[in-house]
Amino acid sequence: MSQRQQRVADLIHQQLAELLKKEVRDSRLSKISLTAVSISPDLKQAKVFYSLLENQNEKEVQKALNKATGYLRHLLAQATVLRYVPKLEFVYDESIERAHRISLLIERALKKDDSDESS
């Protein structure tokens, strides 16, 4: 990713996080966290990765984000000085959930080793 792509991705990440917190009134979107933004080389498309902060229905949140995409893009255009505001695509980030599962598996394996050694 070029420096320009990174700067634009960081700007979009920061602005979208702020807009979701202050401007969007959909309760399904109040408990999400934006984890990363990846932008195409031509700066016309951005993938916005998000995770859920609480146990929520991921499909419902995705539906709400898809519905709010046009509005968020409009707000982003007003909040930034970008010549072209990229098309937004929201993608559920499973990496945090995966890391948590791996951590639990490691803990179980360590506990099993401890119980095997003490026997």
Swiss-Prot record:
Alphabetic keyword roster: Cytoplasm, Ribosome biogenesis
- Family annotation (SUPFAM superfamilies): Ribosome-binding factor A, RbfA (SSF89919)
Q: Name one GO molecular function term.
A: ribosomal small subunit binding
InterPro entries this protein is in? KH_dom-like_a/b (IPR015946), RbfA (IPR000238), RbfA_dom_sf (IPR023799), Ribosome-bd_factorA_CS (IPR020053)
The chain's disulfide connectivity reads none
Top-rank taxon, per record: Bacteria
Q: What is its main location?
A: cytoplasm
For this protein, the record's Pfam families field holds:
RBFA
Q: Name one GO biological process term.
A: ribosome biogenesis
Its annotated compartments are: Cytoplasm
Q: Which GO terms describe its cellular component?
A: cytosol
Subunit structure and binding partners: Monomer. Binds 30S ribosomal subunits, but not 50S ribosomal subunits or 70S ribosomes.
Indicate the family of this protein.
Belongs to the RbfA family.
Q: Which PANTHER family match?
A: RIBOSOME-BINDING FACTOR A, CHLOROPLASTIC-RELATED (PTHR33515:SF1)
Function description: One of several proteins that assist in the late maturation steps of the functional core of the 30S ribosomal subunit. Associates with free 30S ribosomal subunits (but not with 30S subunits that are part of 70S ribosomes or polysomes). Required for efficient processing of 16S rRNA. May interact with the 5'-terminal helix region of 16S rRNA.
The identity of this protein, by name, is Ribosome-binding factor A
Q: Give the source species.
A: Coxiella burnetii (strain RSA 493 / Nine Mile phase I)
Which gene produces this protein? rbfA
